Amino acid sequence: MLEGFLVLKIILIGTLTITSYRAVPEQTKPECTGRHRCETSIGENVSELGVAVSPDLLASGRVHYRDCLYISGVGFRIVDDTTNSRLRNTVDVFVYEKAEEKAFGVRHLKVWVVQPDQK
């Protein structure tokens, strides 16, 4: 082990469906009004650094709340929310504006979990 260095373990989850969502009542909770009063599944305020993952990814044990994901072409994001239960193998990237959401569309990208190596 190298002293003073953090060793990371990078695990490929696979190629997943990547979409986007906004903090509006029809996509989250009735009390959500834009950026305010919208909490994620872990009780944090929504943020452009957060993503929602489909329940099947959480149930599989491959992904956990607060995990750091690297999404090809998107960057690093933190798992802080859950998508609708009907979705499978999906990550929703948070965006603020409707135009951003429309421009993002639906993508199929490689996703990795980045964790400190506990060895």
Feature locations, PLM:
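Solvent-exposed, well-ordered loop and adjacent helix/strand elements within mature globular domains
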Residues: L2-F5, K9-K119
